[in-house]
């Protein structure tokens, strides 16, 4: 299974090895979630100020966060579904704060690789419709995260 991922590094800090890590873990997740070949998403790396702006503008939370997901498959009010056109599946956009990922890796006592992989996977699962608004949903999403991280070798 192959995902098409467009990476944008606004921080100019992200090494190729981290891009490859995310490509591989999301590929593994797509395989385990049975996502069709050719599905697309973008991953943008930003600083804390930029993610704070996005969080404020789109979620009414004026503070930095670690990852934000914008799912393309959620129908907004007044949007029309396009039918009968063969287009690749557009999953959406992930925005990851690199400084926040570094802070959290240190805070949780694990590697930056593991934190970055976790954040990318967490956001990816949101793009697929997983959520953690209820206790039941949280159990399902976090259980799936753990399964995929362990299958990829990034378990705790």
From Swiss-Prot:
GO CC, any one term: cytoplasm
Cofactor note: Binds 1 zinc ion.
Any one GO MF annotation of this record: RNA endonuclease activity
Cofactor: Zn(2+)
Subcellular location: Cytoplasm
Domain of life: Bacteria
Disulfide cysteine pairs (residue numbers): none
GO BP annotation list: rRNA processing
Principal location: cytoplasm
Sequence positions that bind Zn(2+): 122, 126, 132
InterPro entries, per database record: MetalPrtase_cat_dom_sf_prd (IPR023091), YbeY (IPR002036), YbeY_CS (IPR020549)
Keyword terms: Cytoplasm, Endonuclease, Hydrolase, Metal-binding, Nuclease, Ribosome biogenesis, rRNA processing, Zinc
E.C. numbers: 3.1.-.-
Record-linked HAMAP family: Endoribonucl_YbeY (MF_00009)
Annotated family: Belongs to the endoribonuclease YbeY family.
Role description: Single strand-specific metallo-endoribonuclease involved in late-stage 70S ribosome quality control and in maturation of the 3' terminus of the 16S rRNA.
Protein name: Endoribonuclease YbeY
């Amino acid at each position: 299974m192959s995902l098409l991922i467009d990476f944008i590094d606004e921080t100019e800090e992200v090494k190729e090895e981290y891009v490859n890590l995310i490509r591989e873990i999301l590929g593994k997740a797509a395989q385990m979630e049975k996502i069709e070949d050719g599905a697309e998403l973008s991953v943008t790396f930003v600083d804390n100020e930029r993610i704070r702006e996005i969080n404020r503008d789109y979620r009414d939370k004026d503070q930095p966060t670690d990852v934000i997901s914008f799912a393309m498959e959620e129908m907004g009010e007044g949007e029309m579904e396009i039918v009968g056109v063969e287009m690749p599946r557009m999953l959406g956009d992930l925005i990851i704060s690199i400084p926040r990922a570094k802070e959290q890796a240190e805070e949780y006592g694990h590697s930056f690789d593991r934190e970055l992989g976790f954040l990318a996977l967490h956001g990816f699962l949101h793009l697929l419709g997983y959520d953690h608004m209820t206790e039941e949903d949280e159990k399902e999403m976090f259980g799936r995260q753990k399964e995929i991280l362990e299958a990829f070798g990034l378990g705790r």
